[in-house]
From Swiss-Prot:
Oligomeric and partner information: Homodimer. Interacts with GLMN. Associates with HSP90AA1 and HSP70 in steroid hormone receptor complexes. Also interacts with peroxisomal phytanoyl-CoA alpha-hydroxylase (PHYH). Interacts with NR3C1 and dynein. Interacts with HSF1 in the HSP90 complex. Associates with tubulin. Interacts with MAPT/TAU. Interacts (via TPR domain) with S100A1, S100A2 and S100A6; the interaction is Ca(2+) dependent. Interaction with S100A1 and S100A2 (but not with S100A6) leads to inhibition of FKBP4-HSP90 interaction. Interacts with dynein; causes partially NR3C1 transport to the nucleus.
Protein name: Peptidyl-prolyl cis-trans isomerase FKBP4
Gene that encodes it: FKBP4
TPR repeat extents: 270-303, 319-352, 353-386
Domain PPIase FKBP-type: 50-138, 167-253
Lineage, opening ranks: Eukaryota, Metazoa, Chordata, Craniata, Vertebrata
SUPFAM superfamilies per the UniProt record, alphabetical: FKBP-like, TPR-like
Keyword Ribosomal protein found: no
One biological process term in Gene Ontology: protein-containing complex localization
Residues found modified as Omega-N-methylarginine: 373
Compartment(s) of residence: Cytoplasm, Cytosol; Mitochondrion; Nucleus; Cytoplasm, Cytoskeleton
């Protein structure tokens, strides 16, 4: 039964009582959720915890009274499975469906709205019947940018709510697949942030940080979150390869959070992490270096209990971290982020040579030539011997000249076209294709008189 057939079936009020029938799919086998498949779905895959699912549905009370339907709104309903966003019966039943499947779900009150009901349409202790059609489902996007680069599908939920943080020690079992071929199978204990040393993709560590103890998940990685344009020769992974990992987070020990460290510990850890970040940067592991420098900023930025001597050390570490973050962002071609990091550095030292120069580079990369020129000019004003700034300033001047030449040519062509159109209009007017000035004036007088008469009549 399609969504359209569902609509036809439920058009008009149903007054006949609905039967209690179906297979018991409730976890306790207490007949709290009964399911009848009305149309089989396709394929073998079913939604997993955290998947975004898209359905059409109609709901009735047991006496046949319809109380809701997505078909009436002509818009599919979507939610994240297993997250408690819908009644318990839905989280249970829709996890058993395949794409294209239509089923009837009968839900006892304890799996629906319970003793409270959902006034005014659903009374207390109501047993409900739904007809549901599953259209699609997709895994949970774990990226900040929501670009689909890290997709997780939870096979088994973990314990509690705690998750590994940056620097946590984790124990995992993993299997890596490229085009369904196993290329990596290991059990590891390592520190989050050090995974690249163990040939683990950046995106895999980010996924582990979103897992709970005991969780089993499947993680899909796009190339930019896997082994990128280089690939991984050790595993015979070619450039720009998409990967799949099956992960089991066995256990973890969280690293100390910023609020758990005193000022002395923060400075000590920041120095260690800065050195680690520098090593990563020199090895070309810019994403890993980025994480180290971000730690320093998070530890020191809002600390107010430093002594005068500690405050000076903290400021130097913060300045170096923002400058290094800017350099990492430049290498990763994240130019807006590079500008932001430079601005943070220049808030601490407004005449900082590296901050001004790197901001100029970022502005130049996004074709903001005037802003780039201003930064390079200031570098040379403060540091006249900076040869790189002289070179980049010359590049800016050249780009600005080219831009002005293009704009001049564009405007010249525009004015030329306008002149041609004006001459064409004059030629048509003189050939009698358009009314003469006298005719236009007479018509205008006539229209004005008519309008005035209409206004006076309406008034």
């Amino acid at each position: 039964m399609t969504a359209e057939e569902m609509k036809a079936t439920e058009s008009g009020a149903q007054s006949a009582p609905l039967p209690m029938e179906g297979v018991d799919i409730s976890p306790k086998q207490d007949e709290g959720v009964l399911k009848v498949i009305k149309r089989e779905g396709t394929g073998t895959e079913m939604p997993m915890i955290g998947d975004r699912v898209f359905v059409h549905y109609t709901g009735w009370l047991l006496d046949g009274t319809k109380f809701d339907s997505s078909l009436d709104r002509k818009d599919k309903f979507s939610f994240d499975l297993g997250k408690g966003e819908v009644i318990k019966a839905w989280d249970i039943a829709i996890a058993t469906m395949k794409v294209g499947e239509v089923c009837h779900i009968t839900c006892k009150p304890e799996y629906a709205y319970g003793s409270a009901g959902s006034p005014p349409k659903i009374p207390p202790n109501a047993t409900l019947v739904f007809e549901v059609e599953l259209f699609e489902f997709k895994g949970e996007d774990l990226t900040e940018e929501e670009d689909g680069g890290i997709i997780r599908r939870i096979q088994t939920r973990g314990e509690g709510y705690a998750k590994p943080n940056e620097g946590a020690i984790v124990e995992v079992a993993l299997e890596g697949y490229y085009k369904d071929k196993l290329f990596d199978q290991r059990e590891l204990r390592f520190e989050i942030g050090e995974g690249e040393n163990l040939d683990l993709p950046y995106g895999l560590e980010r996924a582990i940080q979103r897992m709970e103890k005991g969780e089993h998940s499947i993680v899909y990685l796009k190339p930019s979150y896997a082994f990128g344009s280089v690939g991984k020769e050790k595993f015979q992974i070619p450039p720009n390869a998409e990967l799949k990992y099956e992960l089991h987070l066995k256990s973890f020990e969280k690293a100390k959070e910023s609020w758990e460290m005193n000022s002395e510990e923060k400075l000590e850890q920041s120095t260690i992490v800065k050195e680690r970040g520098t090593v990563y940067f020199k090895e070309g592991k810019y994403k890993q270096a980025l994480l180290q420098y971000k730690k320093i900023v998070s530890w020191l930025e809002y600390e107010s209990s430093f002594s005068n001597e500690e405050a000076q050390k903290a400021q130097a570490l913060r300045l170096a971290s923002h400058l290094n973050l800017a350099m990492c962002h430049l290498k990763l071609q994240a130019f807006s982020a590079a500008i932001e990091s430079c601005n943070k550095a220049l808030e601490l030292d407004s005449n900082n040579e590296k901050g001004l120069f790197r901001r100029g580079e970022a502005h130049l990369a996004v074709n903001d030539f005037e802003l780039a020129r201003a930064d390079f000019q200031k570098v040379l004003q403060l540091y006249p011997n900076n040869k790189a700034a002289k070179t980049q300033l010359a590049v800016c001047q050249q780009r600005i000249r080219r831009q002005l030449a293009r704009e001049k040519k564009l405007y010249a062509n525009m004015f030329e076209r306008l002149a041609e159109e004006e001459n064409k209009a004059k030629a048509e007017a003189s050939s009698g294709d358009h009314p003469t000035d006298t005719e236009m004036k007479e018509e205008q007088k006539s229209n004005t008189a008519g309008s005035q008469s209409q206004v006076e009549t309406e008034a």
